[in-house]
Amino acid sequence: MEKSRRALIVRGGWDGHQPVETTSEFIPFLEQNGFELRIADGTAVYADTDYLATVDLIVQVNTMSSIEPEEFAGLQAAVLCGTGLAGWHGGIADSYRANAEYLHMIGGQFAHHAGKDPTQRTGEQSDNYLSYTVHISERGKSHPITRGIDDFDLETEQYWVLSDEYNDVLATTTQEVRPWDAWNRPVTSPAIWTRDWGSGRIFVSAPGHRVEVVQDPNVRTIIERGLLWAAR
């Protein structure tokens, strides 16, 4: 009998990103693909290096949180040795702002999401929901995560991501110029990317603000494929 692979879901941080609800969307998929699951509410599990060495995939949704040095050391060591790391939105790209080594490993950090016209804002999260297009890159057209998916539109937060050239960018999105914003030319950021780190694979989807976003057929397919791609 083939041995099951192990997946660890680490969720927590800001409740506005619905870490429990969004990760729960993918539990049946992981189980159907033969993963034995463990769920951790927070980062303490990362300090258990013996356990992490047995994990094939970490799914992290933990926004605007912090991580202790021994916890990050455990996470980093696991990825370097081949454990896959995957996540979406601020749960992976805005997790531990004070840890430069984490940002280096992930390859992207949320910096901004543009808002609606100030005269139309109501003080709700939807003030930051814009209609925009996710453009599949040339690399993305042939990558197993995004192959066969055309450019698609979303209405949700549009992440401006600070990143580097080491990422394999599978899709992008462009922040347009509007009269009330500070920038004066369009800015293109990665929306979907992967990154090899040691023997491990990292997958990041910037879209994924709330359940309704990960339920979008294109986003769901990309995340599901990304989880399988990242796993050892």
Predicted regions and their residues:
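Short, solvent-exposed loop/turn segments at secondary-structure junctions
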Residues: 14-15, 65, 92-94, 151, ...
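Oxidoreductase and adenylate-handling cofactor-binding alpha/beta cores
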Residues: 102-109, 151-168, 218-232
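Extracellular ligand-binding/catalytic regions of CAZymes and related secreted enzymes
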Residues: 2-6, 32, 178-191, 196-232
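Non-transmembrane alpha-helical segments in soluble domains
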Residues: 27, 76, 103, 146, ...
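A glycine-rich, often tryptophan-bearing local segment used as a flexible ligand/cofactor-contacting loop or short
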Residues: 66-144
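Helical hinge/lid and interdomain linker segments adjacent to catalytic or ligand-binding clefts
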Residues: 4, 8-9, 14-95
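Catalytic beta-strand/loop cores that center a nucleophilic Ser/Cys/Thr
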Residues: 30-31, 38, 54, 122-198
